[in-house]
Amino acid sequence: MIRLISLDLDGTLLDPSGAVTPAAKAAIAKARSAGVRVVLNTGRPIPEAFWFAREAGCDSLVCALGGGALADSATGQVIRRWDIPEPSGRQALELCLHRDIELMIFAGDQILMDPFSKRSLLKTYPFPAFHDNGVVTEDPVAYMEEHNLPLTKIHGDQNPGRYPLKELSALPGLQLTSSNDHDFELVAKGVDKGRALALLSMMYGIPLCDCAGVGDSENDLPMLQAVGTPIAMGNAASAVKAAACRIAPSNGEDGVAQAIFSCLSQAAL
């Protein structure tokens, strides 16, 4: 019996234009009216996760930052955050800066960007929830030290040939993943969407075997491997499809709505 559905955001809940469709909202509302929890599990920062959870009509608990944080959109409380250890965090930042990479540096409740990244991200992330918490600084490392900010995640995009992946992989206490075929995400070792979902589901009193997960990317694999009913989107990577028990249509075909309805049919059994 499915009692909780965990949804990835980009490539899953959001359509190709970056919107939550009316069909997706209707499916979420129907699931919640049937007593099934529906939660977001995203690589996006906490403020954006909150915004989309409200926009879609999801339950208040969210997994954000690729499993790096668990928070409550109803209260604004950050329940748990898993930060990158030092000195690996500083070393990783120094490796990534000044390479013409579009960087998002998630530090506390702020998103740090250098001027190069800000220009690019204005086009990539038009959402007010993102830019309201964005800080542009010439020296992110010095800014973090000055304000005593922890580092939770680094996201790099737009210039794969410049990514220092080999050097980052050699740093202790860190792990690399991705949310599409042209980016990278750096988090603390052991941090992933499955681990965060395990804590979230425990808070709701629901075992993982009674949970479903819906996703499309490499960073969704731990979530899909953790739940009893893993569902891949039609636009998912081949490894994600291989980990799923069934495949929904793509995010351009309201696949997430159909995935939710399939869970409701299973929940009624």
For each feature predicted by the language model, list its residue ranges.
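Mg2+-dependent phosphoryl-transfer enzymes with acidic/Ser/Thr/Gly-rich catalytic loops
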Residues: 1-4, 20-21, 33, 185-269
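Asp-based phosphoryl-transfer active-site loop
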Residues: 3-17
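Active-site phosphate-binding/coordination module
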Residues: 19-124
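Structural motif corresponding to alpha-helix initiation and N-cap regions
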Residues: 25, 46, 86-89, 137, ...
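Short active-site oxyanion
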Residues: 35-39, 59-60, 152-154, 209-210, ...
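Short, structured coil segments at secondary-structure junctions
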Residues: 56-58, 65-66, 74, 169-172, ...
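Short hydrophobic/aromatic-enriched beta-strand-loop microsegments
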Residues: 59-65, 82, 125, 175-179, ...
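Conserved acidic, metal-coordinating active-site core of Asp-based
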Residues: 95, 99-102, 106-214, 218-223, ...
